[in-house]
Amino acid sequence: MTKKNLPLNFLLDKILKRLIQVTIALLATLLIFVGSFPSLAAETTTIPLTEEQWQQGEEMAQKAIEASQKGDFPQAEAYWTQLIDEFPTNPALWSNRGNVRVSQNKLDEAIADYNQAIKLAPDHPDPYLNRGTALEGKGMYQEAIADYNQVLAINPEDAMAYNNRGNAQAGEGNWQQALQDYQKATELAPNFAFASANAALTLYQLGESERALQKIRNLVRKYPLFPDMRAALTAILWTKGQQGEAESNWVAAVGMDYRYQDLDWVRNIRRWPPAMVAALDNFLKLKL
């Protein structure tokens, strides 16, 4: 998972680029290592602010972002709440608070925040993307797909929405549709590494193990510090009897991210496809 927060100068009617916060805790909560991304940006009419109000708001928004980057999500939530109390008609603030609530697994409260952001900015794609992520966290995949469809109706070239919809399709067991979405995401954003990773894992689930292996090898070469693909390469190589190479990739994978030793995390948080989970399980059982 990653999230995107907008600075407070959203209040000045600027359409701002999505700002991705990358933290390990946030990615894990969002299921996807790039599985499901939220964000927000839209035009709005606001009451003119004094220079002092603008400065105070900017400072508090920056504190909220810094708190999130440090993993202090309760403090970040408190900052966004203060800003909402001051500027309740700003949809970005509601969406940003929803993001940090997702990070604390407060999914229902996050969805309520995204609902308010959508009410205030119904024609902007980002709050739908955010809400889709939270819905995925609750296992409400069809509802998440509907939100991602709305994003794509507004912006047909949103690579994150395709990746996220692929995750939701995978949650429903629609592996072919998931693959198509992941591939579209990588077509739109060739350097979207996690979408490429999701496509590779899905190929394995669909029985195309050689294509999956080739794609995973390519990703490991391009991104040698990518533990997800190191762990996947370990699992596939082990099933092919290439124990030595499997072991060396495993040492690298767990050295970067120990969570791959936890099948429950791999299955339910990272959400690898069942065939990949089974391959890793086979490796771990024999290893232990």
List each language-model region with its residue ranges:
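Structural marker of alpha-solenoid helical repeat scaffolds
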Residues: 86, 120, 154, 188, ...
